[in-house]
């Protein structure tokens, strides 16, 4: 049993956070004595020390100066990791930098430049393992982020190892996007077969668990991007011009501010704020099927009497900071607190802040946008996801659900579960660690893992299928060199040419049958190429060459969105 480490960087829209995880890796190839368990993933290196670090702003802010992303952004994070992780295992410790919605908003060229400079900087200055830049340092789509978050949440709640235990749904609101992920019941698998993403995670006894998930994302619907769209809506609705003062119902009364020469004055009206933020949901946009939720996306109907959801990130910060209502959600109480806050004078809230009457994590910037964020969270939950406003379930059960002990609401906001922070990066490391051990076993010597964690048997001659064009090029290049060499050596002298012909005949009798047989013919190679599709930069096709190294899963942690197309950078 050896200790493995992994470095995972969540490169979000407002900042980048490095997290260190570790787990035990069994070097014994036997699976017979393994229990039916997932690997035990721990935060940090197991000594109880600091395991995460965050820097601001996000890496997308380096779009105009990408060459500085290493020294001015990543250095502090990776220096922290290099100091925390034992130096003798640096070369076998993988680094994954996964950029999310902030980078998705940039153009492809800007993304590629930032990621390319980031990867080169890490490779040049650190000994950590990055076998493939395009798979280790990349922009992940919203579906991947949602799937990882679902895995992390249910892993911490211990709902994954036993199939007779109900899993919980996952909601995540970041700065730029919103994600939802939940397991589909058997009754809905047929109707939504084209929308299912089946995730596979490996157990230590060699089995794999399979979960059919509905996962989707809304780019531009995170709290910060929604606020930007809200300001644009205010300006458009009141024909804002330089010198005009516009009313902002989502800001506290008495607060004034200026954006690009346009003055805004808070009025603190929650009902009007809810009305305006409701328009941001784009409920009028048509869907391809019913029910139509928001922004043209249909979500399978959820039976909230039998399905519980947890919300992280902004769902937690908005309900917990100032309001102190994180945890089991109760709509009437939360609405009342938000209404009271939005109607408070701005100077009164500043006085409470300076007198340290609020939570330590609260600052002036949070107070400025809290009324808007609370209104937006209310609309997304109830008008977007159709979470019931009453804690009584649809079948009039009084206690609701009991998946999470002591919680009796269809929605719960969380930051930690059993003192471990709920982060989608934990789901990413779980998928990596659980299937890494399986792929190292002799039983899976001819298998590879697809982006969803499924182990697939490699077809015959898979090495030819993976590199047909490259193989043809190499053979052609060798032939040309041999031809040029023969011209120089033998020239046009008849005797030399005769000796050369005899040499070729002897070579063909001794060696060539193994090289020029039907199994190695150029026709076979060309036939294999007919099975290949031209791959877009954002997709991965074909099985890998089997290896038992720790790199095998690092090359397979790619995940392609069905709705968001996030091109992968063409690194050299």
UniProtKB/Swiss-Prot annotation:
Side of membrane Lumenal, spans: 1-470
Q: Kindly name one Pfam family recorded for this protein.
A: GDA1_CD39
Query: Which ranges sit in the Cytoplasmic compartment?
Result: 492-572
Q: Which stretches are transmembrane?
A: 471-491
- What GO biological process, any one, is recorded here? CTP metabolic process
Cofactors: Ca(2+); Mg(2+); Mn(2+)
Highest taxon, organism lineage: Eukaryota
Reactions performed catalytically: a ribonucleoside 5'-triphosphate + 2 H2O = a ribonucleoside 5'-phosphate + 2 phosphate + 2 H(+)
Q: Does the keyword Membrane apply?
A: yes
Give the cofactor note: Divalent metal cations. Ca(2+), Mg(2+) or Mn(2+).
Q: Which UniProt keywords apply?
A: ATP-binding, Golgi apparatus, Hydrolase, Membrane, Nucleotide-binding, Transmembrane, Transmembrane helix
Active-site residues?
A: 145 (proton acceptor)
The record's listing under InterPro entries reads:
GDA1_CD39_NTPase (IPR000407)
Q: Could you tell me the EC number(s) of this protein?
A: 3.6.1.5
Q: Name one GO cellular component term.
A: membrane
Please state the pathway this protein functions in, per its UniProt record: Protein modification; protein glycosylation
Q: Name one GO molecular function term.
A: apyrase activity
Q: What does this protein do?
A: Catalyzes the hydrolysis of phosphoanhydride bonds of nucleoside tri- and di-phosphates. Required for Golgi glycosylation and cell wall integrity. Involved in N-mannosylation of proteins in Golgi.
* Family in the record: Belongs to the GDA1/CD39 NTPase family.
Entry protein name: Golgi apyrase
């Amino acid at each position: 049993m050896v200790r493995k480490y992994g470095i995972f960087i969540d490169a979000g829209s407002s900042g980048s956070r490095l997290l260190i995880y570790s787990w035990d890796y069994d070097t014994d190839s036997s699976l017979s004595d393994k229990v039916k368990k997932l690997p035990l993933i721990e935060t940090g290196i197991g000594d109880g020390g600091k395991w995460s670090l965050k820097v601001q702003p996000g890496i997308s802010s380096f779009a105009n100066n990408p060459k500085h992303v290493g020294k001015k952004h990543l250095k502090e994070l990776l220096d922290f990791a290099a100091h925390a992780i034992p130096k003798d295992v640096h070369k076998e410790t993988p680094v994954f930098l996964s950029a999310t919605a902030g980078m998705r908003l940039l153009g492809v060229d800007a993304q590629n430049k930032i990621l390319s400079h980031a990867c080169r900087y890490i490779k040049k200055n650190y000994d950590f393992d990055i076998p493939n830049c395009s798979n280790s340092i990349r922009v992940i789509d919203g579906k991947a982020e949602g799937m990882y978050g679902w895995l992390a949440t249910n892993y911490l709640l211990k709902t994954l190892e036993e199939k007779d235990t109900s899993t919980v749904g996952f909601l995540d609101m970041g700065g730029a996007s919103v994600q939802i992920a939940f397991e589909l019941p058997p009754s809905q698998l047929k109707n939504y077969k084209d929308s299912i993403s089946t995730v596979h995670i490996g157990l230590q006894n060699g089995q794999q668990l399979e979960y059919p998930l509905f996962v989707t994302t809304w780019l531009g619907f995170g709290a910060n991007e929604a606020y930007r769209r809200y300001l644009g809506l205010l300006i458009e609705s009141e024909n804002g011009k330089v010198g005009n003062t516009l009313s902002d119902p989502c800001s506290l009364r008495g607060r004034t501010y200026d954006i690009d020469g346009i003055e805004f004055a808070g009025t603190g009206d929650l009902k009007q704020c809810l009305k305006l933020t409701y328009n941001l949901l784009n409920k009028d946009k048509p869907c391809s099927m019913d029910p139509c939720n928001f922004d043209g996306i249909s979500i399978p109907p959820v039976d909230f009497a039998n399905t519980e959801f947890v919300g992280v990130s902004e769902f937690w910060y908005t309900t917990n900071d100032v309001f102190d209502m994180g945890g089991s959600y109760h709509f009437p109480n939360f609405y009342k607190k938000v209404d009271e806050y939005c109607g408070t004078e701005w100077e009164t809230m500043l006085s409470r802040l300076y007198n340290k009457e609020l939570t330590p994590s609260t600052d002036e910037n949070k107070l400025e946008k809290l009324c808007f964020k609370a209104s937006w969270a209310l609309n997304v939950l109830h008008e977007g996801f159709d979470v019931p406003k009453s804690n009584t379930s649809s079948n009039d059960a009084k206690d609701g659900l009991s998946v999470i002990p002591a919680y009796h609401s269809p929605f719960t906001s969380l930051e930690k579960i059993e003192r471990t922070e709920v982060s989608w990066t934990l789901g990413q490391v779980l998928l990596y660690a659980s299937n890494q051990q399986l792929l190292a076993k002799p039983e899976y010597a001819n298998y590879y893992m697809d982006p969803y964690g499924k182990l697939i048997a490699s077809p015959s001659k898979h090495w030819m299928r993976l590199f047909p064009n490259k193989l043809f090029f190499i053979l052609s290049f060798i032939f040309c060199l041999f031809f040029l060499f023969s011209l120089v050596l033998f020239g046009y002298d008849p005797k030399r040419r005769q000796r050369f012909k005899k040499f070729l005949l002897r070579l063909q009798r001794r060696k060539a049958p193994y090289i020029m047989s039907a199994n190695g013919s150029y026709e076979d190679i060309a036939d294999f190429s007919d099975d290949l599709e031209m791959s877009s930069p954002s997709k991965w096709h074909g099985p890998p060459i089997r290896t038992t190294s720790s790199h095998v899963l690092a090359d397979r942690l790619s995940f392609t969105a069905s709705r968001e197309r996030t091109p992968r950078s063409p690194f050299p």
